[in-house]
C-alpha cells in the first residue's frame, strides 16, 4: 500500500522526514532545485513546493524530476502553474514517483494528473494508490492469443474488429458522433464483458471534457446517485494546463486502468483523447529541458515516449486493456512524425465519415476506410472474412457507380449493377444501429448485436433473400429479424393508408 503525496501527512511532519532542497532557477514550468550533497532525488521522483506568494495565497506545486544536472542540482517539470514561486523556496523530495488513487473509488469521478478529484464531490479514498511510472508487463505475463473484442456494434465487429488488448485509432472531425460512439463502447463493455473504462482527456478543450461528463451523467454511464455503479473514471489534463500535466495525464489514466486489469482481473477500455496532444506536450517539455529537436521540431525521444506508454496497454493472463485513441492528424499529413509513430502501434482504425453522418446513418463509421489487422481468415474464420469482403466489394462497387447514377440515373445501369446498388443501400442502412446511450435523444431502444447475428444478417442480404424488402426496413435496427419485422409493419402501414 502506498500513500499519495498529494494527500499525505501534514507539511511539518513531511519536512521532518523528507529530503529538503531549494529552488535555484525557474524557467516557465521548469525548475532547477539544489539539494544537499549526497541527497539527490531519483529521476521521476515527485517534488513538492509549499508556501505562500507575495499576496499571501497558498502555493502547492508538485513537480517531477527529469534530469540530474550535476553540482547537486536537478531539473524538474511542474504539474501545475508556477506563478508565485521564487528562488530560495523550500522543495520537499517525496522519495517516490507521483502516485494516484486506484480501484473502485475512482469510478464516476474526475481527476487531474496528480489523482486529485476536481469534480467538487468531496475527497476520494486514497488508501490504495499506485505510482504512474511502471515497466510494461513481462513477456511471460502476456496473453498472446489473438481474440476479437466483441463490441456489439455491427459495423465495427464485422468490418474492422477490435483485438482484445489491442489499440485502435479513432479518426473523425467535430460533430460526426465520436463522443456517442465512445459512450456506447463504455456502456457495452460494462454490460457484455463486466468491464470498466477509463477516459484520459489529454490536452483537449475543457468545454468538450465538461460536455462529455454531462452526457455521461444523462445517459447513465455515470450514476450520480451511486457513484460505485458508474462504469467509467475520468482523468483530465486539458489544453490550458502546463505541458508537464498534459504529458503525464495519459500515464495517470493508464495506471488506473492497470489496477482494474491486474488486481480486479477485468477487461478494461482505455480512451485517450487525444494521443497527438501527448506527443505535443512531450515536445514542449523536451525543448524546455534543452534537448536538441528532431524531425519537424519533435523531441528526439518521440519513439521511446510513445513506446513506453503503448507497451503498457496490453492483454495479460489476468485481464486486458483495450485502448481507443483519438488521433489528430496535423494539416492532414499522415507522414508527420507524431501520427506516423502512433500508426506503428495500432491494430485497427475506425474512421468516422461526415458524409454518412449527413445521411443520418449512425454510427457514422466509414466501412471502406476503417481497417483492422484482425480481419484475416485464420483469426476470424472463413465465414466472417468472406462476408466482410463481400460487403466491402458491394459497397465499393456502389461507390464507383455513384457518379454514373448522378449523371444518367439508375435506369441506365445494367440489371446486375442495379441489384448491386439496391443491396449496397440495404447494407449501408443495416450498418446503422440504435445505441443505448442515445435512447434519451432518439426514443429508440438500444441494441447489442452479437457477432454471429451480425454475420448471419449480412449473409442473408448478400444472398438476395431480402431483395424484395424496402431499404427503410434495414435502417436503425438490431439484428436481421428486426428488419424483417419492420418490413412487415411498413407494409401494413402502407396498406392502411390506402
Swiss-Prot record:
PROSITE patterns given for it?
Answer: ATPASE_ALPHA_BETA
Which GO terms of the molecular function aspect are on file? ATP binding; ATP hydrolysis activity; proton-transporting ATP synthase activity, rotational mechanism
Residues reported in the UniProt entry to bind ATP: 172-179
Q: Name one Pfam family in it.
A: ATP-synt_ab_N
What InterPro entries does UniProt report for this protein, alphabetically? AAA+_ATPase (IPR003593), ATP-synt_VA_C (IPR055190), ATP_synth_F1_bsu (IPR005722), ATPase_a/bsu_AS (IPR020003), ATPase_alpha/beta_chains (IPR050053), ATPase_F1/V1/A1_a/bsu_N (IPR004100), ATPase_F1/V1/A1_a/bsu_N_sf (IPR036121), ATPase_F1/V1/A1_a/bsu_nucl-bd (IPR000194)
> What organism is the protein native to?
Capsella bursa-pastoris (Shepherd's purse)
Q: Which protein are we looking at?
A: ATP synthase subunit beta, chloroplastic
The record's note on quaternary structure and interaction partners says:
F-type ATPases have 2 components, CF(1) - the catalytic core - and CF(0) - the membrane proton channel. CF(1) has five subunits: alpha(3), beta(3), gamma(1), delta(1), epsilon(1). CF(0) has four main subunits: a(1), b(1), b'(1) and c(9-12).
Modification Phosphoserine occurs at: 13
Q: Which reaction does it catalyse?
A: ATP + H2O + 4 H(+)(in) = ADP + phosphate + 5 H(+)(out)
Zinc-finger is among the record's keywords:
no
Q: What is its main location?
A: plastid
Membrane topology, record value: Peripheral membrane protein
State the protein's purpose: Produces ATP from ADP in the presence of a proton gradient across the membrane. The catalytic sites are hosted primarily by the beta subunits.
In which family does this protein belong, per the annotation? Belongs to the ATPase alpha/beta chains family.
Modified-residue entries (Phosphothreonine), positions? 6
UniProt keyword Ubl conjugation present:
no
Where in the cell?
Answer: Plastid, Chloroplast thylakoid membrane
Could you name the Gene Ontology cellular component terms for this entry? chloroplast thylakoid membrane; mitochondrion; proton-transporting ATP synthase complex
Q: GO biological process: any one?
A: proton motive force-driven mitochondrial ATP synthesis
Protein EC: 7.1.2.2
Keyword vocabulary terms for this entry: ATP synthesis, ATP-binding, CF(1), Chloroplast, Hydrogen ion transport, Ion transport, Membrane, Nucleotide-binding, Phosphoprotein, Plastid, Thylakoid, Translocase, Transport
Which CDD domains does the record cross-reference, listed alphabetically? Answer: ATP-synt_F1_beta_C, ATP-synt_F1_beta_N, F1-ATPase_beta_CD
Task: Fetch the PANTHER family from UniProt.
Answer: ATP SYNTHASE, ATP SYNTHASE SUBUNIT BETA, MITOCHONDRIAL
HAMAP family the UniProt entry points to: ATP_synth_beta_bact
